[in-house]
Amino acid sequence: MIASKETKEKIRNFIGGFASGAASTLAGHPFDTLKVRLQTEGSTGRFRGLAHCFTTTIKEEGFFALYKGVTPPLLGMSIINSCMFGAMNIVKSKIHTDKSTPISLGEIMVSGAITGWIVSFVACPIETVKSKLQVQYTGVKLYNGPIDCIKKIGIRGLYKALIPTGFQRNSLYAYFGCYELAQRYLRREDGSMTMGRSFIAGGIAGTGFWLTNFPFDVIRSRIMTMPYNESPPRYKGMIDCAKHIYRVDGLKGFWKGFSPCLLRTFPANGATFVAYECVMKFFPM
């Protein structure tokens, strides 16, 4: 039985997403580790800024400490991106029903927002494990690795940050919207995109994504990295966490870790779309 064109397109999107997730993780994980550490240090002031966080981490824990927690996202981001591109393709096909006309920017952005909430159910547990492992410093460790972490926190712990993750991932409207806009300006006269142009468009998409959701990402990181055995829990929920951040650090607290995030976003998201477009190119319909 020969697969239909629609089925082949779905499979191709899932494969492209898987490859893009691996590329994104390898390119951006060190910056992500610095981001999470700066976001979750609270009022203790462990680090004086991005440069100090980087040098302290290397000095105390070695270079590969920047890749702490990389196992879950290496596999996890591949799964997340696979679901993201696959779901985006399906949602777009449901929203844009008139195939005789090109899909509009508005339809792409609405599709991205819906996709964000769908993907949150996959992203939340994976990123919770990653974040918990990233903030383990030298000394006593709560978790011996991803499996031990999952066993200790359970299903409830894996999904504790689902709501802020949903709001954060909702910004896929900006991600895919910015990528589409960038493509329109960067395409060559024949309509094609080189790998370099795809990389730039991906970097722009990533920048748009983070600019529109970073405060939610800070809240999400705080909730994700709470010790599983803490009683009573530090935060009762997303709103309580937001109030605590504002009370302690003011508005600037919602932008902690933004510098490494911006440094990470171009290489990571550029690599994401280059890998994705390569799969689309080498596995034609």
Swiss-Prot record:
Places the protein is found: Mitochondrion inner membrane
Keyword Mitochondrion (UniProt): yes
Cross-referenced Gene3D superfamilies: Mitochondrial carrier domain
Ranges for the Solcar repeats: 8-94, 103-185, 193-282
Membrane-crossing segments per the record: 14-34, 70-90, 103-123, 157-177, 199-219, 257-277
Mitochondrial intermembrane side: 1-13, 91-102, 178-198, 278-285
GO molecular function, one term: L-ornithine transmembrane transporter activity
Keyword Transmembrane: yes
Keywords: Membrane, Mitochondrion, Mitochondrion inner membrane, Repeat, Transmembrane, Transmembrane helix, Transport
Topology relative to the membrane: Multi-pass membrane protein
Top-level taxon in the UniProt lineage: Eukaryota
Mitochondrial matrix side: 35-69, 124-156, 220-256
SUPFAM superfamilies assigned: Mitochondrial carrier
GO biological process, one term: mitochondrial L-ornithine transmembrane transport
Cellular component aspect of the GO annotation: mitochondrial inner membrane
Function: Mitochondrial solute carriers shuttle metabolites, nucleotides, and cofactors through the mitochondrial inner membrane.
Family statement drawn from the similarity comment of this UniProt entry: Belongs to the mitochondrial carrier (TC 2.A.29) family.
Name of the protein: Mitochondrial substrate carrier family protein L
Protein source organism: Dictyostelium discoideum (Social amoeba)
Lineage of origin: Eukaryota, Amoebozoa, Evosea, Eumycetozoa, Dictyostelia
